[in-house]
Amino acid sequence: NLFQFARMINGKLGAFSV
């Protein structure tokens, strides 16, 4: 699912952001 993939990327970016 594209949405799931996007969520995974967003989660990784969020972790890096923190």
Curated annotation (Swiss-Prot):
What is the annotated role of this protein in its UniProt record? Snake venom phospholipase A2 (PLA2) that has several activities. It exhibits anticoagulant activities (by inhibiting activated coagulation factor X (F10)), it shows hemolytic and cytotoxic activities (cytotoxic concentration(50)=65.8 nM), and inhibits cell migration in human skin melanoma cells (IC(50)=25.6 nM). In addition, it reduces tumor lung colonization of B16F10 melanoma cells in BALB/c mice by 65%. PLA2 catalyzes the calcium-dependent hydrolysis of the 2-acyl groups in 3-sn-phosphoglycerides.
User: What cofactors does the UniProt entry give for this protein?
Assistant: Ca(2+)
Q: Which GO terms describe its biological process?
A: lipid catabolic process
* Principal subcellular localization: secreted
Q: Which family does it belong to?
A: Belongs to the phospholipase A2 family. Group II subfamily.
Q: Which GO terms describe its molecular function?
A: metal ion binding; phospholipase A2 activity; toxin activity
Q: Tell me which domain of life the UniProt entry assigns to the organism this sequence originates from.
A: Eukaryota
Signal peptide limits: none
The protein's name is: Acidic phospholipase A2 Drs-PLA2
What does the PTM comment state?
Contains 7 disulfide bonds.
Keywords on this record?
Blood coagulation cascade inhibiting toxin, Calcium, Disulfide bond, Hemostasis impairing toxin, Hydrolase, Lipid degradation, Lipid metabolism, Metal-binding, Secreted, Toxin
What the record notes about the co-factor is: Binds 1 Ca(2+) ion.
Describe its assembly.
Monomer.
**Cellular compartments annotated:** Secreted
According to its UniProt record, the EC number is 3.1.1.4
State the GO CC annotations. Answer: extracellular region
Q: Which reaction does it catalyse?
A: a 1,2-diacyl-sn-glycero-3-phosphocholine + H2O = a 1-acyl-sn-glycero-3-phosphocholine + a fatty acid + H(+)
Q: Where in the body, by tissue, does this protein show up? A: Expressed by the venom gland.
The EC class name is hydrolase
